[in-house]
A protein has these predicted regions:
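N-terminal anchoring/stem segment of glycosyltransferases
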Residues: 1-64, 76-78, 82-83
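Membrane-proximal basic amphipathic "stem/tether" segments
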Residues: 1-10, 223-284
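A broadly used, surface-exposed interaction patch
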Residues: 64-76, 83, 96-97, 101-105
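Short beta-strand-to-loop acidic/aromatic patch adjacent to the donor-nucleotide binding site
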Residues: 82-92
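Conserved donor-nucleotide/metal-binding helix-loop-beta segment in metal-dependent transferases, i.e.
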Residues: 96-126
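Short, flexible, basic/aromatic active-site loop/helix in glycosyltransferases
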Residues: 132-148
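Catalytic core and acceptor-binding pocket of nucleotide-sugar-dependent glycosyltransferases
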Residues: 150-216
């Protein structure tokens, strides 16, 4: 592991965009961040109104009524590094981060002027796997044009200015941001600028869906950190967890031409799809 005294000259910051109703999640997330990645870039937490104090984290309260986009955009105006590692508060770092892997990735991003470098893959199998290895590295793929959600809110290192342009000055939620990216068709056409790394270099566990803890990730984290207080939030029951895993499996393995038929099956099983809620303006 590379030992560095400071990240000040590495041109990278970390931005966690938080939802004020997840204060209990912030406490766990930042505890794990400080434990498993203590030597890291300057870290910011963007909130609406709450401004708790955390070690090694600068909290930026954007204002009441701020949705994901407004919090992210205004926090990015405060940050002055060229690149930003964008995270959500339910991305828990579950074991020590190897700074050598992070720095190697940052060097690659700098050298090839990459705008979007995704570092977390949750799908079992997806169109990204068809991407050509970048510079011969089988773990780093060129994002193909037909990838679902080519730009998304999985953990990723973004060019800060490009991220601000992509978000814009509106005030909307995270799901609406991702839905907007479905129609993007010029990914890596004239120049390679969008990559995906399947190594999970930050050792992230995505822990919460539908405001509840996922069973398997929570079990793994509690095995390592039994003292964590999860009393402020429910855990998905077996049926809810099954529905989520079924949906994830469907998106991972289903060809685009079969998504609509499989969604019909999912709705018959009372499975909720974010695209339906966004289309019906039910997400707030």
């Amino acid at each position: 592991m590379e030992n560095i005294d400071t990240w000040a000259d590495k041109d990278l910051s970390i931005l966690i965009v938080g939802f004020d109703g997840y204060k209990d999640v912030w406490d766990i997330d930042i505890y794990l961040l400080n434990k498993y990645w203590s030597n890291r870039p300057k870290t910011y937490l963007a909130t609406s109104v709450l401004k708790p104090e955390y070690k090694n984290v600068e909290v930026i309260a954007i204002g009441e009524g701020s949705e994901w986009s407004k919090k992210a955009y205004n926090a990015l105006k405060v940050i002055n590094t060229k690149y930003v590692l964008l995270l959500l508060e339910d991305f828990f770092i579950s074991s020590p981060v190897n700074n050598t892997l992070v720095l190697d990735s940052l060097h690659l991003i700098n050298e090839y002027k990459i705008k979007f470098y995704q570092v977390l893959v949750q799908l079992i199998k997806s169109s990204w796997e068809k991407g050509t290895p970048f510079q011969g590295n089988k773990h780093i793929k060129i994002i193909p044009k037909d990838k679902k959600y080519p730009l998304n809110l999985q953990a990723a290192i973004w060019d800060r200015e490009f991220l601000m342009e992509t978000i814009g000055k509106g005030n909307y939620n995270a799901w609406q941001f991702e839905i907007k990216q479905i129609s993007i068709s010029d990914i890596n056409v004239n120049k390679i600028e969008y990559l995906i790394d399947d190594r999970n270099i930050l050792n992230i566990e995505h822990t919460i869906v539908q405001s509840k803890y996922l069973r398997a990730p929570l079990k793994r984290i509690l095995k390592r950190e039994p003292s964590i207080d999860i009393a402020g939030r429910d855990v998905l029951n077996f049926k809810e967890d099954f529905k989520y895993q079924f949906k994830l499996l469907m998106y991972s393995l289903t060809p685009q031409c079969l998504v609509k038929p499989f969604k019909k099956i999912g709705r018959w099983l009372s499975i909720d799809f974010v695209t339906d809620r966004v289309t019906n303006n039910k997400v707030c």
